[in-house]
Swiss-Prot record:
Name of protein: Large ribosomal subunit protein uL4
The protein's role, per its UniProt record: One of the primary rRNA binding proteins, this protein initially binds near the 5'-end of the 23S rRNA. It is important during the early stages of 50S assembly. It makes multiple contacts with different domains of the 23S rRNA in the assembled 50S subunit and ribosome.
GO biological process, one term: translation
InterPro entries linked: Ribosomal_uL4, Ribosomal_uL4-like, Ribosomal_uL4_dom_sf
């Protein structure tokens, strides 16, 4: 598929040919996208939730009263879950929430995420993403010219420092290098903005997979 390339000032920068196997998938697999997003969010959870179990609660372990002859139910330690101040039964413990997702499924999800943006007309290719000075107002004005209000910008192998500084105070705009491209961030923003260098990097990223 062919897409026009624009400049940050709104001018034309030619055109670019995008590979259909990455940007031109017609039937978007929502189930694959959901699996990948769930995998990403689970992997980044801290998993530091913790509650005291029976051997950690600061209460006596002495038997409450004798086993027989009271007419009451049989009880032992006051740390048991049924008592006020006792332990929590089967409470959360420190653990990792991460789970495995095959590399091929992750790659397929990224293809479908990129294709979904192209299909919706929410994909913009920039000639380059560099600024002469780190001015937020100037960058916001440039974004307004090209219709960007809520976007993920993949700015190249290295993010231009002026661009990074200017963009960090603009709400709903994320700027990442090529290596930071991921399914969750693509889907959470309305528009995907790629530089020509980023497009080339995406193509190179999928080449080893195709060769295999």
């Amino acid at each position: 598929m062919k897409l026009d390339v624009i400049k940050l000032d709104g001018g034309k920068g030619g055109s670019i040919e995008l590979p259909d196997d990455i940007f031109g998938i017609e039937e978007i697999r929502a189930d694959i996208l959901q699996r990948c997003v769930t995998w990403q969010l689970a992997k980044r959870r801290a998993g530091t939730h913790k509650i005291q179990v029976r051997n950690e609660v600061s209460r006596t372990g002495k038997k409450m009263y004798k086993q027989k002859g009271t007419g009451g139910a049989r009880h032992g330690s006051r740390r048991a879950a049924q008592f006020v101040g006792g332990a929590k039964a089967h409470g959360p413990v420190v653990r990792s929430h991460a789970f495995d997702l095959p590399k091929k499924v992750r790659a397929l999800a990224l293809r479908h995420a990129l294709s979904s943006k192209a299909k919706d007309g929410s994909l913009i290719v920039l000639d380059s993403a560099t600024l002469t000075e780190a001015k937020t107002a100037a960058l916001r004005a440039s974004f307004e010219k090209i219709g960007v209000t809520n976007a993920l910008v993949i700015a190249g192998a290295q993010v231009d420092n002026n661009l990074k500084l200017a963009a960090r105070n603009i709400p709903n705009v994320d700027v990442l290098p090529n290596a930071g491209l991921n399914v969750y961030d693509v889907l959470r923003r309305r528009t995907l903005v790629l530089t020509k260098d980023a497009v080339a990097a995406i193509q190179a990223r999928f080449q080893p997979e195709e060769a295999a």
